[in-house]
Each structure stands twice: as structure tokens, then as C-alpha cells.
UniProtKB/Swiss-Prot annotation:
This is Phosphoribosyl-AMP cyclohydrolase. Its cofactor is Mg(2+); Zn(2+). Its main location: cytoplasm. The keyword Hydrolase applies. Catalyzes the hydrolysis of the adenine ring of phosphoribosyl-AMP. SUPFAM superfamilies: HisI-like. GO terms for molecular function: magnesium ion binding; phosphoribosyl-AMP cyclohydrolase activity; zinc ion binding.
Length: 129
């Protein structure tokens, strides 16, 4: 099992169907500092990210590990991984290729609470998935 130099609270964000713990991961553009997405990761996903430099997450809906952009081509190259003060959330500082959101938007945070769209759609999801 992968060991890290800091204590991480896997399980703070729930568990997989197999009982593996999850941590919340925020992906942020390393240059613009725009918040791109929130996802979850298992210990294995974090280890793969640290080893490969490519963002890996855990899909709770599909119950599987996934590499960002493996299907769509909208990849995240991870420049740095930061840990929050409680060790139960991570921040991936990334170089984003294409949009981060499966809806085709640059960021998953492309709507206001009033329902207004505030972000650009940078690709057609029908062409990517």
C-alpha cells in the first residue's frame, strides 16, 4: 500500500463500495487559479497521480478509478499536490488541456445559485463521450 509523507484521512469523504476510503480533491488551474472541479480519490488514485503526474480520481457513480481525460482528451497535468490542514482534502494544481467539466465547460463551477451561466463551454460533450 502506498505511503505518503503526510497523514491523509482517507474516509473523510466516504468510502467506495469495496470499503476504500475517499478524500475530496479540488482541481485548480495552476496559472489562472480558477477552480476547475471537485472530485474524490482513493489512496490508489492519489498514488497514481503522484507517480504519473496525470490526475487520477475515483468515480463514485461508476465505482472505478479513472484518469482525467482518458476518454475525452481533456487532461490534467498535475504540477503540485497540496494537503489541507486536516488531511482530509487535497488540492491538485494542474495544467488543464480542454475543459474540465463533462458538460463541456472550462470549469464545473459554471453556474451561479440563480442559475446563470458564468463560464465558457469549450468543447461539445457529444463529440467527446
Amino acid at each position: 500500500m502506498e505511503e505518503f509523507d503526510v497523514d491523509l484521512d482517507f474516509g473523510g469523504a466516504g468510502h467506495t463500495d469495496d470499503g476504500d476510503g475517499l478524500v475530496a480533491v479540488i482541481a485548480q488551474d495552476a496559472d489562472s487559479r480558477d477552480v476547475l472541479m471537485l472530485a474524490y480519490a482513493t489512496r490508489e488514485a492519489v498514488a497514481r497521480t503522484a507517480t504519473t503526474g496525470r490526475a487520477h480520481y475515483y468515480s463514485r457513480s461508476r465505482d472505478e478509478l479513472w484518469e482525467k481525460g482518458a476518454t475525452s482528451g481533456n487532461t490534467q497535468s498535475v504540477d503540485e499536490i497540496r494537503v489541507d490542514c486536516d488531511g482530509d482534502a487535497l488540492l491538485y494544481l494542474v495544467a488543464q488541456t480542454g475543459g474540465a467539466c463533462h458538460t463541456g465547460h472550462e470549469s464545473c463551477f459554471h453556474r451561479t445559485l440563480d442559475g446563470d451561466t458564468v463560464g465558457d463551454q469549450v468543447f461539445d460533450p457529444d463529440d467527446a463521450y
